[in-house]
């Protein structure tokens, strides 16, 4: 039997994390993972709900079942990811969707990725179980402007637009899924505009502003995690950066607090000199 390169472990301080199960060499591929869910970004103009590429009023072809606009590739209407909103439109709304504005961010698309998560509850319990184990930070989000916006534009919208039974689909459950998407979603720059994907093991990689791994994506949207320039010993934690490593500490901390709801205490953030780089230093122009 081939020993797995990585494993998921748990720690009282950091929760679940990914560790090396063997010694990993520098630049070694440690993980290639298919997404649990993929869908459009929350703020986006109309996109094809199959390939997730931008579409216009002239290029759009309406799905014959549900009316959601797709691109001209006939395979996109049968795409596995499109099935969620297509089924909900046909079976619950019982009326085709009509999208008329193709020039601005469209509110109907804010809920698509959340729908694709909720759809798993009754249609793929295994994926639903994995999704609901992911962190949502609902306690930290509750009461904030983004949380209340999600209540109005996603939770209330879904209940009204798709005629959902609140007993079957509680508002708090929908808002929890919104949090799971926000906290665990990876921006995938393979399309214009980029889309969002949620991965199982990939969501458990911890953050560091001096990460020992990098992430990229394969052409088909699989997450690829590769070690950085240094080897990782067996048992060592694998980390990626959730923010832009080319930002200074203040900007990184603000971004992480706003989007991931934690205060980073990695070696770089804990050192006023940013490990001797003085990356956030202000250069005096006076001699």
Where are the model-predicted features located?
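Glycine-centered flexibility motif
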Residues: 15-17, 29, 144
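Catalytic cores of large soluble enzymes that bind and process phosphate-bearing ligands
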Residues: 12, 78, 146
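Catalytic cores of histone-lysine modification enzymes
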Residues: 97-223, 227, 258-259, 265-268
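A eukaryotic "domain-start" boundary segment
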Residues: 1-17
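C-terminal SET catalytic tail plus cysteine-rich post-SET Zn-binding segment of SAM-dependent SET-domain
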Residues: 3-5, 19, 29, 40-114, ...
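Residue-level signal for pocket-adjacent positions within structured domains
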Residues: 3, 13, 81, 194, ...
């Amino acid at each position: 039997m081939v020993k797995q390169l990585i494993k998921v472990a748990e720690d009282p301080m950091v929760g679940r994390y990914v560790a090396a199960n063997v010694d990993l060499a520098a630049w070694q591929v440690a993980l290639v993972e298919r997404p649990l869910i993929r869908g459009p970004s929350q703020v986006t103009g109309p996109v094809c709900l199959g390939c997730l590429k931008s579409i216009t009023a002239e290029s759009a072809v309406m799905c014959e079942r549900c009316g959601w606009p797709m691109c001209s590739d006939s395979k996109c209407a049968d795409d596995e990811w499109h099935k969620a909103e297509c089924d909900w439109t046909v079976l619950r709304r019982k009326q085709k969707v009509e999208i008329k504005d193709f020039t601005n961010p469209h509110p109907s698309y804010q809920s698509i990725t959340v729908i694709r998560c909720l759809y798993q509850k009754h249609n793929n319990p295994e994926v639903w179980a994995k999704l609901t184990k992911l962190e949502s930070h609902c306690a930290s989000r509750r009461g904030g402007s983004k949380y209340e916006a999600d209540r109005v534009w996603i939770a209330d919208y879904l209940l009204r637009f798709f005629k959902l039974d609140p007993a079957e689909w509680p508002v708090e459950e929908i808002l929890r899924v919104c949090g799971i998407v926000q906290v665990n979603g990876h921006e995938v720059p393979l399309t214009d505009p980029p889309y969002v994907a949620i991965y199982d093991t990939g969501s458990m990689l911890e953050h560091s502003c001096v990460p020992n791994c990098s992430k990229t994506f394969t052409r088909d949207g699989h997450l690829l995690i590769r070690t950085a320039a240094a080897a990782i010993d067996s048992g060592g934690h694998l980390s990626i950066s959730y923010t832009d490593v080319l930002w200074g500490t203040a900007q990184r901390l603000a971004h992480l607090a706003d989007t991931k709801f934690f205060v980073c205490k990695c070696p770089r953030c804990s050192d006023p000199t940013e490990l001797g780089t003085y990356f956030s230093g202000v250069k005096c122009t006076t001699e």
